[in-house]
Amino acid sequence: MRPRKYIVVVLLSIAYTMCLAVGYPSDGTDDSTKSLKSGNRIRSHTPDIGTEERTLTWLKSMLRPSSSSAKVTKEIPEVVKSASDFKVRQTLSAITRKLGLHSQRLKRFASWLRKTGERLTRKKVYYAGYIAIVDSSSSQLKRLSVTYGSAFLFVIGFIVLLAFAMTAV
C-alpha cells in the first residue's frame, strides 16, 4: 500500500475524533443536571455498535486494495470462461503490449471516467480504442495524418493549386 493512504487514514481518523470531541461537553454533570431540571431527555453520546461496525468496515475498505475484477467475475461468470480460452489470452496479451494503452491521453480519459462515474457506452469504448491505436503508431507523419487528416489534405491541395497557378502565369 502506498504511504499516501496511511497519511490520509491518519488524518481522517484525527478529523473524525476531533469532530466527535467538539460536540461533547468536557464535564458531563453540568449538562446532565440542566437537562434533568428542564425535563429533557439525556441523549447518549456514545456511538452504538452499528456505527462502530460501519466505521471499522469503512476503514478496512480504505486499507484494502481495490479490485474491480473480483466484482466482474462474481457478476458475470462467462468472463472467467472466456479468459481461460487460449486465443482470448493470446489476443489480450498482444493488446496489452501495445504502447498506446500506456499513453497519457488514455490515462487522462480513464481518470475522467472514474471521476465522473459515468457508464461506458459504445462511443466511449470506441474513443478509447481510437486513442490507443493512434498513440501506438510510431510514425509522426502517420500520427499527424490520423489526427489532422482533412486539414492536412486541404493544406497540401491548396499548396498544389498555388504551385500550378504560379507556373501558369
Curated annotation (Swiss-Prot):
It is a single-pass type I membrane protein. The chain crosses the membrane at residues 149-169. A motif (dEER) lies at residues 51-54. This is Secreted RxLR effector protein BLN03. The gene is BLN03. Secreted effector that inhibits stress-induced relocalization of the endoplasmic reticulum tail-anchored transcription factors to the nucleus, thus affecting stress responses. Interacts with host transcription factor NAC069. GO terms for cellular component: extracellular region; host cell membrane; membrane.
